[in-house]
Amino acid sequence: MSTRNNLRQLKIINIFFVSITFIFFLTACSELEQNQYFSPNAQPYNDFTATINRDVVSIGSEISKLLSQDLAIKDISTEGNTTFGQINLANTSLYVDCGMMNNEIYVDYINRIFESSLRADLVIQLKETNQNATNVSLDISYTFISLESGTTWKFSSNKPASIWVGTPAEGALPQRVCLSRHTLEESLISKIRDL
C-alpha cells in the first residue's frame, strides 16, 4: 500500500512540476508589451496681443517690473520697444504637450527615464498705436531637452516642433511632436492686460 501511495504522490508531484514548467514557458514566450506613443492634440492658433490705453514708455516700464519682480524672470533686456526674458520652468507638463507614451504624459516619461529641462525665452514687442495706446504682442520660444540623450525640441507659442527619435518603440513612428499648452502665454498676457 505504501508503494502505491508513494507512486500516487510521485505522479501528483510530477503533474504539478510539468504544469508549472508549462505555465513558465507559456508566459516566457508571450510577446513583450510594446510602448505606444500618441501625438498631442493640435492647439488652435492664438494671438497673444493686448492693447493697453497707456503710452509705450510707461507700459514698457511696467512690463519690465512685472517680469523681474512678480514673475522672477531672469536675464531681462530691452532693445528699443522689445523686451526679452528667460525663465527655467519646473513641471514641464504644465507648459508643453508632447503627447503620451502608453498611459503616461510623454514629457513626464522623458523626465523619469532621462531627466529633462525646459527653458522659455520671452519676446514682448510694444508698438505705439497713438499717444495713449500701446499694442503689446507676446511670443515664447521653448527649449525642452532630454538631459541624458541630448534630444532637444525647440518650438514656440504657435509653432510646434517635430523631431525624429533614434530608437522608437517597435512598430511606432519615429516622429515626436511637441507644442505649447499656452499656459504661460495666457497667464502673462492676462497680467499685462491688468497693468
What role is predicted for each listed range?
Residues 16-27:
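Bacterial N-terminal signal peptides
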Residues 1-11:
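N-terminal secretory signal peptides that target proteins for export/translocation
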Residues 7-8, 16, 137:
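Intrinsic disorder/low-complexity detector
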